[in-house]
Amino acid sequence: METQTVQQELESLPTTKMAQTNPMPGSVGPWKITIYDQENFQGKRMEFTSSCPNVSERNFDNVRSLKVECGAWVGYEHTSFCGQQFVLERGEYPRWDAWSGSNAYHIERLMSFRPICSANHKESKITIFEKENFIGRQWEICDDYPSLQAMGWPNNEVGSMKIQCGAWVCYQYPGYRGYQYILECDHHGGDYKHWREWGSHAQTSQIQSIRRIQQ
């Protein structure tokens, strides 16, 4: 298949109804991602520097490999930033299991994506709470934890969270496995009162590992 290279400038990309997920209008942030319609960086490709709510609008039926050249991104299983989430940090992803292999679920679709504007690995802080609405035991975290329970958290669930700065990815299971939840200080005012606010795919309050997202 003939390779087609298409470069899009920030102002030429489609706007999204979720305005808070985009960089400030007129700014060009440190974000760049290249997607391919075939595995191993083959086939048609396209570069983005801002959000894409639907790759099919760019004549892609799916994203089968990608390269993150600048910044941190989050990919979604479905269009309009819905479904399972996949954190995409700088590097190469030759096929779907490179971004969802640790997810423990077989998901080959990636239909939308956006930059994580608040990612700041050096200055990140989150407070987790035992119950919903910031009630119960609380724990302030500024580092990565492959197992919350091993570090003293009393159970395998988190009721609510406050993101003071940075962006975090929380995982359903220890060792950064299971469903991924991307939580950012510039979404919901940094306050996630209930596990249903973690994402459209959230089905449980189970969180057992957590780490900072690297910009």
Curated annotation (Swiss-Prot):
GO molecular function terms listed in the Swiss-Prot or TrEMBL record: structural constituent of eye lens
Residues modified as S-methylcysteine: C82, C117
Chain residue ranges for the region called Disordered: 1-24
Domain Beta/gamma crystallin 'Greek key': 31-70, 71-117, 124-165, 166-214
N-acetylmethionine modification, residue list: M1
PANTHER family cross-referenced by the UniProt entry: BETA-CRYSTALLIN A3, BETA/GAMMA CRYSTALLIN
Swiss-Prot/TrEMBL domain comment: Has a two-domain beta-structure, folded into four very similar Greek key motifs.
Protein name: Beta-crystallin A3
Name of the encoding gene: CRYBA1
